[in-house]
Swiss-Prot record:
Leader sequence residues: none
Family from the record: Belongs to the SNAP-25 family.
InterPro entries the UniProt entry points to: T_SNARE_dom (IPR000727)
Entry GO terms, CC: plasma membrane; presynapse; SNARE complex
Species whose genome carries this gene: Caenorhabditis elegans
Domain t-SNARE coiled-coil homology: start-end pairs: 37-99, 170-232
Phenotype on disruption: RNAi-mediated knockdown results in defecation abnormalities.
Tissue note: Expressed in intestinal cells.
Keywords: Cell membrane, Coiled coil, Membrane, Repeat
Name of the protein in question: t-SNARE protein aex-4
Domain of life of the source: Eukaryota
């Protein structure tokens, strides 16, 4: 049986004194405070950048909403104008039908050029309305009115400490809290503007479908009138 000598027995581990333990705890607390302060500064910088980004989002959303509202008005005008054009073409078609009994009259040779001009002019009018009126929205006045939505958006959290739990209770945390409140209000404004844009798009979708149908009807009527004119001129 093996025997251990006294020399082979390890020395007992010396436990730190109470003073040493307190110093180590204090050192760790100091390091933790420094880490918290560092993270707070980083969070503050991030919140400032978020405010800038959300402000730009609001500006873009306001401009887009204003453009959609202006586009909605122009779509109404285009739809009304197309309906009037089709009504006028139907009248022309009816009159040509009534004149078919006078085939061979020189009057129809005079009619040919104005009718071609009328068809070309009608397409130009629609093209000008789409290109000019839709690309020049009245943004400034609508932007100013819509910006009030951003400044007066619902303040869901107004009391201190609702967004973050205070650790240092210093000026950095105060500013960070204010920034978070501003971010919350900005996001609320963006959400409201997004809803407005969605509503506008939903309202305009059936109008675009009706305009497409009116355009097809217009082409059909013009083709029919052209056929009648060709028969009369030959």
């Amino acid at each position: 049986m093996a025997r251990k000598t006294i020399d082979s027995i390890p020395e007992p581990i010396a436990l730190p004194t109470e003073e040493t333990v307190q110093k180590r705890i204090k050192l760790k607390m100091v390091d933790l405070d420094a880490e918290i302060a560092k993270l707070n500064v980083q969070s503050l910088d991030s919140s400032i950048q978020m405010i800038r980004d959300i402000d730009q989002m609001n500006v873009d959303a306001v401009q887009t909403t204003a453009a959609l509202e202006d586009q909605d008005e122009q779509l109404d005008k285009i739809e009304a104008n197309l309906s009037n054009v089709i009504d006028d073409l139907n009248v022309v078609s009816h009159n040509i039908t009534a004149m078919e009994h006078y085939c061979g009259c020189g009057f129809f040779r005079i009619l040919r050029a104005p009718f071609k001009y009328f068809r070309k002019r009608e397409r130009d009018i629609i093209k000008e309305e789409v290109l000019e009126k839709m690309t020049s929205p009245k943004l400034r006045r609508k932007e100013e009115s819509n910006m009030m939505m951003f400044t007066n958006s619902s303040k869901r959290r107004e009391s201190t400490g609702d967004f973050m739990k205070r650790l240092t209770c210093d000026a950095i945390e105060d500013e960070l809290e204010r920034n978070l409140m501003q971010i919350d209000q900005g996001l609320e404004s963006v959400k409201n503007l997004a809803v407005d844009m969605h509503v506008q798009l939903k309202l305009q979708e059936p109008k675009l479908n009706r305009i497409e149908e009116l355009t097809e009807t217009n082409d059909f009527v013009v083709e029919g009138v052209n056929d009648k004119v060709k028969k009369l001129l030959h």
